[in-house]
């Protein structure tokens, strides 16, 4: 893919060659804003359409360097861009909360919770993803990344929206740490045969299929915990938007 040199300040393509930099790279002069710039990938103007394309690729199991090759941006620019994308994700994860009365919620709200293994830098540095899902709408209502302790279970429970904590019935596997964290009247621990956590387990598979850094044997693993959490949150926020778009208004 060939990208024309555009002014990084105004985006204009009305430029002319203006000698070379001390490193031998072609220098350009913008006729519109009169700024000088060199034809490096990080100085190319990235349109809104191209940025939207990159956001989609971030959710399609493609490594960062693969995105650079496919779209024609520099790794330096892409790293700055993903930090901005991750920072823009809302803490509420774009969850659409249920409407209606408490009398309806207490009978209809069903949720599932599960945990999933991942790592940062090396497999010895385990990072467990704790997830909670609305079993009806398939929205991910909360997540937490940490160890596999009771404290992480508490962190997940604290992140669950209040309406679910107060009224939903939560199905989990029989991992002991859930007991005492999720109130007994709201919690049902089940066996595999009960198939009450199928939806959240299927979402775990979706994560591994769609995020390259979560593949068990991958060269695209996370190097920083902040980006690891950010990538997961970024995917969940967009996933929830897709799910809420299918819900009745």
Model-inferred region functions:
Residues 1-249:
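Residue-level recognition of single "structural anchor" positions
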